């Protein structure tokens, strides 16, 4: 993994250290009634938990660009394989996490493209909350789920 200008910690006004000097973004990928979940490698922040592909945005990237770059790096997908629905923002004043909600098109075949993932699984929406979720994703899952198409 190459160093990027967005890599680094932010001491947030909420009292939590967040990864991403310029904010962060991830992709919540939908297929039928399932979402793509990433079992995070043990060596990453909150390793061993489940979440969505994502990470720090660089200074020159929009949150959509950052989420797409991270999705390509982590799960091997590109913009032509998804249809973006909308972006949901979790704002903390001086830091943000944007979740790009998108449908996986028929030509979308995610795979663990780097060592940040132990595995990927398509999980039924109603089963996600029972998983050992990344703490930030766990806090936001019900709000995200309630607004899914």
Predicted regions and their residues:
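Catalytic phosphate/metal-binding cores of nucleic-acid and nucleotide-processing enzymes, i.e., regions
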Residues: 17-19, 49, 65, 85
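A generic fold-level signal
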Residues: 19-22, 30, 44-45, 92-95, ...
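Acidic surface patches and DE-rich sequence motifs
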Residues: 5, 31, 90
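Conserved Nudix-box catalytic region and its N-terminal flanking loop in Nudix hydrolases
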Residues: 30-74
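Acidic, metal-coordinating catalytic segment for phosphate/diphosphate chemistry
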Residues: 1-26
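Unchanged
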Residues: 55-149
């Amino acid at each position: 993994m190459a160093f990027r200008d967005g890599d680094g910690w932010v001491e947030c006004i909420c009292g939590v250290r967040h990864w991403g000097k310029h904010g962060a973004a991830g992709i919540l990928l939908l297929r039928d009634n399932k979402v793509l979940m990433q079992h995070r490698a043990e060596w990453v922040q909150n390793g061993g938990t489940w979440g969505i592909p994502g990470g720090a945005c660089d200074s020159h990237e929009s949150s959509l660009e950052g989420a797409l770059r991270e999705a390509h790096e982590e799960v091997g997908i590109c913009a032509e394989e998804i249809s973006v629905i909308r972006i949901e923002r979790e704002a903390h004043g001086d830091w943000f996490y944007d979740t790009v909600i998108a449908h996986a098109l028929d030509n979308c075949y995610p795979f663990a493209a780097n060592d940040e993932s132990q595995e990927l699984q398509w999980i039924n929406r109603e089963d996600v909350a029972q998983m050992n979720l990344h703490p930030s994703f766990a806090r936001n899952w019900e709000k995200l789920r309630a607004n899914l198409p």
